Amino acid sequence: PIVTHPSAAETYCPELRKLAVKTGKELGITIHEQGTVVVINGPRFSTKAESKFFTNQGWEVINMTAFPEAYLVKEMDMCPLNISLITDYDAGLVGDVPPVSHHEVIQVFNSNVANLKNLLFKMIENIPADRNICTCGDTKKCSQL
């Protein structure tokens, strides 16, 4: 077996991130260019106590699917990119609002799907064949034991 230990310091491809931000802005999509994601085991919503803890740690997005997938993609010498469709304010962030429901999340997610499709199709048209900023394609070479 081949054992690799790629760095996770910069999890996502800087070149694809730059393209996603540029394309999203061109399409008029609200883009948050950076942020820190905390990944929880799901599928579930976080508790108020967890949400307060995550907020106090400075994490901006709670996600159930951003990891380990991105790390595994890097192990395959591919360029990982995360595009999160924000669906709700977390339970611990906004005063005494009622907790979010699955129904509400699905409604917001479905309303975002058209933007996601437009973004992805436009990005695919513009992904450069030769990448000169990222080193994603060198992960195996640089991290095999």
What are these regions (language model features)?
Residues 1-91, 103-110, 114, 119-145:
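Glycine-rich phosphate- or other oxyanion-binding loops that anchor nucleotides, phosphorylated ligands
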Residues 96:
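Short glycine/threonine-rich loop/turn motifs
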